[in-house]
């Protein structure tokens, strides 16, 4: 039975009912709806709507229903209820009779659903933070095992300067740390309880909303009833955080795809996260990484869709806001799946020490060291930059690395270059010199790994 039928003289058309009903997706809020209802039943005792005995009967029935939901949430979908609120109330009435009809006193589905989705989002934030931390720990572990693996660092996908695989891993640790922090920030802002705001103007019962908020594990009650039932900032903020984090994961996946390619051959992905070809028997495709990269669009699409949904809505609640759920459910599921899969990808990764070093020795990635060397000899940087550029052109022409040129060849471009130049052109020297905080020197990378391990205990 609909919760609003008294005003109407005609039955709802089935076409509209199918279009309007949301149980097929908001059933995921069943636990939150039940927990919120238990909290509301306690509040109704304080304003003499329910007796202590009646409240206990309702709480026992709701707790029983909660156990049933947790054991088989999919069973909800067999029902014909309009939404999860209708379903919970219907099942409650089945258990306790007319007493169940008293529970909705002073409450609207507007503040009810606002509560449910906030409670759900808070729970997902905690779960997502755990997954993000697990990926960070796996990256730190991978970095620790590959501290001395030298590889080329890239700009414009061209070899730029030598780095280590560990330094690359730690770059993603930092990106994910910002994602974790954004989740924490979002949690603090969403930690306000809208229940008791009614349809839009507040409940007519003198309920202590601060006590109600505390009972439902919120930091405080919301301050404005009109805003409370209209607010979907927490959904948009989580979608924004998810979109940005998915962009980080996509970059990670793209790097892994390139590193795994036959052209680079820096890493080998496990058979457990790759697939083959139905035609070409030699293929081993990085599908896990490609799917992470490919799923970014659906998360960003959910953010865009939600922004468009709320941008023109007058206060307060509008049915458009029912469109908030499918996007956030799918986006956060997708994000968590991708974070967990990225962690799994790293579990059995094999890094080729020989191939990465071979690649780092090519591409004149020690050119900046030569420019800095000339600066140390008193040559202005702009001049040294030009000199090294000409030297690289020559080295390419004669098919040599900079470290392979003779002093006589160097003197074609600058007499400031002496025998000590060879020491600074080595890969190890290139790494060691980048010793400022955050740099690629093995000492700094080891410090970063140790600090991260301490932080993520």
Curated annotation (Swiss-Prot):
SUPFAM superfamilies hit by this protein: L-aspartase-like (SSF48557)
PROSITE patterns reported for this sequence: FUMARATE_LYASES (PS00163)
Keywords assigned by UniProt, alphabetized: Amino-acid biosynthesis, Arginine biosynthesis, Cytoplasm, Lyase
GO molecular function, one term: argininosuccinate lyase activity
Reactions mediated catalytically: 2-(N(omega)-L-arginino)succinate = fumarate + L-arginine
CC terms in the record's Gene Ontology section: cytosol
Its EC number(s): 4.3.2.1
Gene3D superfamilies: Fumarase/aspartase (C-terminal domain), Fumarase/aspartase (Central domain), Fumarase/aspartase (N-terminal domain)
GO annotation (BP), single: arginine biosynthetic process via ornithine
A Pfam family this chain is assigned to: Lyase_1
Uppermost EC category: lyase
Pathway(s) of this molecule: Amino-acid biosynthesis; L-arginine biosynthesis; L-arginine from L-ornithine and carbamoyl phosphate: step 3/3
Domain of life: Bacteria
Cellular compartment(s): Cytoplasm
Family: Belongs to the lyase 1 family. Argininosuccinate lyase subfamily.
Name recorded for this polypeptide: Argininosuccinate lyase
Species of origin: Histophilus somni (strain 2336) (Haemophilus somnus)
Lineage, opening ranks: Bacteria, Pseudomonadati, Pseudomonadota, Gammaproteobacteria, Pasteurellales
């Amino acid at each position: 039975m609909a919760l609003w039928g008294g005003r109407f003289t005609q039955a709802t058309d089935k076409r509209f009912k199918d279009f309007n009903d949301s149980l097929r997706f908001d059933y995921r809020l069943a636990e939150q709806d039940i927990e919120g209802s238990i909290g509301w039943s306690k509040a109704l005792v304080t304003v003499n709507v329910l007796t202590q005995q009646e409240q206990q009967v309702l709480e026992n029935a709701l707790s029983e229903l909660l156990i049933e939901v947790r054991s088989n949430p999919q069973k909800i979908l067999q029902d014909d209820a309009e939404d999860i609120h209708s379903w919970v109330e219907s099942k409650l009435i089945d258990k306790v009779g007319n007493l169940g009809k008293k529970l909705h006193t002073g409450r609207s589905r507007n503040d009810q659903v606002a509560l449910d989705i906030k409670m759900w989002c808070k729970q997902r934030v905690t779960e997502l933070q755990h997954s993000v931390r697990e990926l960070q720990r796996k990256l730190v572990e991978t970095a620790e095992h590959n501290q001395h693996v030298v590889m080329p660092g890239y700009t414009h996908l061209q070899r730029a300067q030598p780095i280590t695989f560990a330094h690359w891993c730690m770059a993603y640790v930092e990106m994910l740390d910002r994602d974790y922090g954004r989740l924490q920030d979002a949690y603090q802002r969403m930690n306000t309880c809208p229940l008791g705001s009614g349809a839009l103007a507040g409940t007519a019962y003198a309920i202590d909303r601060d006590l109600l908020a505390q009972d439902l594990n919120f930091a405080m009650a919301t301050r404005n009833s009109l805003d409370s039932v209209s607010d979907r900032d927490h959904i948009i903020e989580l979608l924004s955080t998810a979109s940005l984090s998915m962009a980080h994961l996509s970059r990670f996946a793209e790097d892994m795809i390139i590193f795994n390619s036959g052209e680079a051959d820096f890493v080998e992905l496990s058979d457990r996260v790759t697939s083959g070809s139905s035609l070409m028997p030699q293929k081993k495709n990085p599908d896990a990484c490609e799917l992470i990269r490919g799923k970014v669009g659906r998360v960003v699409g959910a953010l865009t869709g939600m922004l468009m949904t709320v941008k023109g809505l007058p206060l307060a609640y509008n049915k458009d806001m029912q469109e908030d759920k499918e996007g956030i459910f799918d986006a956060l599921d997708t994000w968590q799946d991708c974070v967990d899969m990225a962690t799994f990808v790293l579990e059995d990764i094999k890094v080729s020490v020989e191939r990465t070093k071979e690649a780092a020795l090519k591409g004149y990635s020690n050119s900046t060291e030569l420019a800095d060397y000339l600066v140390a000899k008193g040559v202005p940087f702009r001049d040294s930059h030009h000199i090294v550029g000409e030297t690289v052109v020559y080295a390419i022409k004669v098919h040599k690395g900079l470290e392979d040129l003779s002093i006589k060849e160097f003197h074609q471009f600058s007499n400031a270059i002496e025998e000590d130049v060879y020491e600074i052109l080595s890969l190890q020297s290139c790494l060691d010199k980048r010793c400022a905080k955050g740099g690629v020197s093995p000492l700094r990378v080891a410090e970063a790994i140790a600090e991260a391990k301490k932080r993520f205990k």
